[in-house]
Amino acid sequence: MKIIIPNINDKVHYIEDKQSIVLLGANGAGKTRMSVWIDENNPELNIHRISAQKSLNMPEYVRPTELRRAEDNFLYGTTYNDRDWLKSAGKKYNRWGDEPEIHMLNDFQPLMEFLMTENFEKSIEYRENHKDGNQEFDNETKLEKIKKIWEKVITHRKLIVCAGKIEVESKEGNTEKYNGNMMSDGERAIFHYIAEVVSAKDKS
């Protein structure tokens, strides 16, 4: 992977073959603006940016929709046949409200719609393969991956994936199940970060 970064002394610079890049700087030093610059000036790359300013209002219920539409709405805030426009202007105006440096990200609804749609599609695929006798077939869903990771971090709770919603219960079984939108701020934040990373495109 080759990432263009802002010019230094009028010379073009790149970061190549790095799995992780960490930007360090004081408040107001320009870390967010640099990440926006990288996003807007590397159109050939799949870049998925998670804002520090975000809403953590998890929807109580969601409905599955068409898979590509659901993924587009999550990644770009809208859907359109022109993929180049979608990844550039479409994402800037819709996901980031034309203010990518300061806009408060509010994507929990489209994120959950994408996860539930993908879960629904793979459930159908799994059922059809097993009906045809392919008992070895498996197709782990993104929600299953998120559940595994989340439960390793939040060790006293477990997630239950239901039709159109997430429920939570104690692993000790001493509390009633409750809707995922009633999770604590920390539990929802952890779920959101895990889900964003798992749901980003491969090689983002």
Q: What does each model-found stretch correspond to?
A:
Residues 1-15:
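Pre-Walker A adenine-sensing motif
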Residues 31:
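Conserved lysine of the Walker
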Residues 23:
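Hydrophobic anchor at the beta1->P-loop junction of P-loop NTPases
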Residues 27-28:
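Walker A (P-loop) phosphate-binding loop of P-loop NTPases
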Residues 2, 6, 79-188, 195-203:
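Extended helical coiled-coil dimerization/tether regions that scaffold
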Residues 44-57:
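Conserved catalytic segments around the Walker B and adjacent sensor/switch elements
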Residues 11-18, 197-201:
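Phosphate-binding P-loop
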Residues 34-35:
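Post-Walker A alpha-helix
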